[in-house]
Amino acid sequence: MIHVSDGDLTLRGDGSLTLSGWTDGAKIGSNGYSSDTGQGEEDFTGSIHITDDVTISATREYYNPSDTGSAAIGSGEKGNFTGTITIDGNAKVNADATWCGPGIGCGEKGDYNGDIIIGGNAEVTASGGSASAGIGSGWDSTFSGGTITIKDNSKVTAIGSNGFSQNTSCSNPAIGASEKANPDYNPAKAPMNGTITIT
């Protein structure tokens, strides 16, 4: 895990980095709530910039049914996302959350109100975990504002995951706000109050 909560991180050059395995927090970003300790959640208010010819693979591998719903890149479970993630240059990024969090964005039960910018010639694949968007918010989160921008010659593959609501199925968006829980675990879409721009 590369821990970034309120600081600034730049990954540049022409090397590659693989981050895998289970962690309570994001593989790159802020810490997440731990079901073992009952604490640990942390907001992401800083910035992450992935650029040049860097290749990044960030995968949160499934641990157990009480696993935390952190993003692969962004905020951990119960952590709000008000920072900025920029991926540009010729960077190649694969972000896979696997469980209740987005590939890139705000973890489970947090709030998305930051900025994700993908541009240049970047190539990005972002896969959401259970009931989560590929890019955006995790399960049972809010999306109160902020932006997601995809521009220039960048190529983005975003994959939302099916929900696990009782007796129903709920498909979540590739980009945007994820499924919102209710007392009966029937699917309900969270309000999407931010802006998505693809040019």
What kind of region is each of these model predictions?
Residues 1-21, 30-100, 104-128, 135-199:
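Surface-exposed loop/turn motifs in large extracellular/passenger domains
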